[in-house]
């Protein structure tokens, strides 16, 4: 595979920090409803998959206020470090990737959605962030393309947005300039372990020796570790995007990113196009693009931005995120195998937490 072909290049392009994990009260109800709704924010096609159902069982067990609080104690300060890491990398490496420091809007079209968004903003504020509640009128003053359906929203100033593929390509170039060897299209078959220590990798192009290995292979990390008897609570969570060119018949020109709260869809300006990205689908390890899931992105975007034209998208994509059952990234050394570390389970925060993880 190529640099940026996965979720690291196809994501919504937002550095969103300070938010609670997906594990929250009420998720069980949403999971049950998702079994029938192919156009909802969450979709789980009914099928027999014991690993998935065990993962969902554990996920629901973590849907408590106490767990959210424990996660926030870790993730809130980590988010501030992530922002600083991005600002430093972009400036020091002079990376051109459409970096916007104006934050993003979370906008709502229903009263329950607005109440929920305001409650979340209040919780985030308690951890040192500065969300701003905004009326519908002021939202439309700031962004004239917003629909009259909007009832209000939140501005999260401590966030960033960028074109993730351009960011990755620039990082790849800088790394190679510093002597890093990056092999594309290579498949890792297994790890070579001798006397409890990792000594390399077996690939489809031969063996690669190593003194240390960092396993950062997203949702595929679980399968690689499973071969050596280590279990990770991971499931692949499929996300989608549609990109629309800005112009007549296409996407409106918007100033900064926004999240359509009820639909969980991000709208991010990326130069001459706007990316509509989101959804969560648990359907296993596949890259099958379901038309109803893609249509959900467009339908949600059109409700928020009635100026979205009838021209087709310039590109469509889906990719797999590594979803941990407790909503927390899995980072650190593997106790039973010397020289082996893992960095996965970032869920929908892979872009956000990538630099600070490194």
Located regions from the model:
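Glycine-rich FAD pyrophosphate-binding loop
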Residues: 1-10
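Dinucleotide-binding Rossmann-like beta1-alpha1 core, especially the glycine-rich loop
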Residues: 12-135
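Helical element adjacent to the flavin cofactor pocket in flavoenzyme catalytic cores
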Residues: 115-127, 146-212
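Short loop/edge segments at beta-strand edges and connector loops
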Residues: 135, 184-186, 315-317
């Amino acid at each position: 595979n190529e640099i940026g072909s996965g979720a690291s290049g196809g994501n919504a392009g937002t550095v969103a920090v300070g938010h609670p994990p997906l594990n929250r009260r009420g998720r069980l109800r949403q999971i049950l409803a998702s079994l029938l709704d192919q156009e909802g924010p969450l979709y789980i096609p009914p099928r027999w998959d014991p690993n998935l159902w065990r993962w969902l069982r554990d996920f629901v067990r973590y849907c408590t206020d106490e767990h959210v609080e424990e996660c926030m104690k870790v993730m809130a300060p980590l988010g501030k470090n992530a922002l600083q890491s991005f600002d430093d990398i972009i400036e020091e490496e002079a990376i051109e990737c459409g970096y916007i420091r104006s934050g993003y809007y979370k906008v709502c079209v229903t009263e329950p959605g607005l109440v929920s968004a305001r409650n979340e903003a209040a919780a985030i504020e308690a951890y040192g962030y500065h969300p701003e509640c905004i009326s519908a009128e002021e939202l439309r003053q700031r962004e004239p393309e917003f629909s009259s359906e909007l009832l209000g929203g939140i501005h999260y100033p401590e966030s960033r947005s960028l074109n993730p593929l351009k960011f990755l390509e620039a990082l790849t170039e800088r790394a190679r300039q510093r002597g890093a060897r990056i092999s594309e299209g290579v498949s890792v078959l297994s790890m070579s372990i001798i006397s409890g220590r990792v000594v390399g990798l077996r690939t489809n192009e031969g063996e690669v020796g190593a003194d240390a290995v960092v396993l950062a292979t997203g949702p595929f990390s679980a399968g690689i570790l499973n071969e050596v008897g280590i279990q990770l609570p991971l499931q692949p969570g499929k996300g989608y995007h549609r990109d629309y060119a800005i112009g007549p018949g296409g996407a409106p020109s918007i100033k900064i990113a926004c999240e359509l709260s009820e639909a969980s869809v991000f709208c991010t300006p990326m130069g001459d196009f706007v990316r509509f990205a989101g959804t969560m689908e648990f359907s296993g390890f596949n890259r099958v693009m379901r038309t109803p899931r893609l249509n959900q992105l467009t339908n949600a975007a059109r409700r928020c931005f009635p100026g979205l034209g009838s021209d087709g998208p310039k590109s469509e994509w889906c990719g797999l995120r590594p979803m941990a059952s407790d909503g927390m990234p899995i980072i650190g050394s593997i106790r039973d195998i010397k020289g082996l570390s893992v960095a996965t389970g970032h869920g929908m925060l892979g872009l956000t937490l990538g630099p600070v993880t490194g």
